[in-house]
Amino acid sequence: MAITIDIDTARPYQVHVGTFLLEQAGPLVRATAGGTRAVIVTDTNVGPLYQMPVKQSLEASGYEVSICTFEAGEVHKRAETYVAILEFVAEHELSRSDVIVALGGGVVGDVAGFVAATYMRGCKFVQIPTSLLAMVDSSVGGKTALDLAAGKNLAGAFWQPSVVIADVGCLATLTPEQFADGCGEVVKHAVIADPELFAELEKTPLTLELLNRDVARVALIIARNIDIKRAVVVADERETNQRKLLNFGHSAGHAVEACEHFELGHGNCVSIGMGIITRAAALHGICDAELPGRIEELCARHGLKTRCELSADAIFAEALHDKKRAGDTIDLVIPHGIGRCSIDRTPLSTFHDLIAEGLGQKGDASAC
């Protein structure tokens, strides 16, 4: 089974969602990216599991294939890793018409994508996401990034892939914690754009048990999430306006991630960020008083955290590095209801107070 979603950006491409797609990578890459050489960029967790079927499929389609592996983890989404991959690609004499294949989760996709965006001022790029979070979110939309000492995703480029190949079978090797972490972005998509999906997830949560019982249903849920992101990205490819809706929970969430030294997964941090902002919105009467409870309950049923022990000052200090900051303001996604969110330009002092209120702490905006 396979579901195909057309992404009609300035450089259109397709996302294929289904099972047994790793073995079809070669023909799919050949048909969309071309070239004669391919470098598979992967990490120490994913490579041993999936690099061989992808390599063999690419070779059967006429590619000369090399594999570049780096240490797994967000802490390696750094300039040193990026430069090492660039050097590897150059040593293997890739041309601009050749292809870099990202095989892994969001970190692999971000780093490999930035390499593809900058090597020889841009070469072909393919995403093969193997985590739930990467399938429903980071592999689609063309964002690539590195983390800097000052904060998350502060260096990067927009670089759309030639094709995205999401083999749902790869999810079977995730731990329950890794699978749950990906659900943070699933819940986010439902909140910002799809009340029906939210209600379906309330009735039947997305879990590894569901994957084992009904892989076709999981594939449909993943495709639905991709379609939500597709609609937003196509309307605003460079994130000047509407695409910022996808950042619901991210300004506080990225700050939590940095405070936790990237030891807490991105999806959990987004879930915490959604909880903070929604609780604050309810206190101000922006949304119904019941909304925070609904979102927190759905997150909890997916194994996600919505609260943390960090101080508002600590989170705010990290959030000052957020890309959505503009001088003394920051663009925040504010929930009004399921499927109804707005992008509000918010003074930093107000943002600090919202964080404090969402944490149940007293506000003190003196830090800004």
Locate each region found by the language model:
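Short glycine/serine/threonine-rich phosphate/pyrophosphate-binding segments
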Residues: 107-114, 135-136, 255
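C-terminal charged capping/lid subdomain of soluble metabolic enzymes
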Residues: 184-187, 286-368
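Residue-level signal for inorganic ion chemistry
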Residues: 18, 40, 78, 129, ...
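A glycine/threonine-rich phosphate-anchoring loop and its flanking beta-alpha core
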Residues: 114-207
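ATP/NTP phosphate-donor binding region
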Residues: 1-99
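Active-site segments that bind and position negatively charged phosphate/pyrophosphate groups
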Residues: 204-314
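Non-catalytic interfacial helical region
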Residues: 86-103, 112-127
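Generic secondary-structure signature for well-ordered alpha-helical cores
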Residues: 91-94, 160-163, 169-176, 184-196, ...
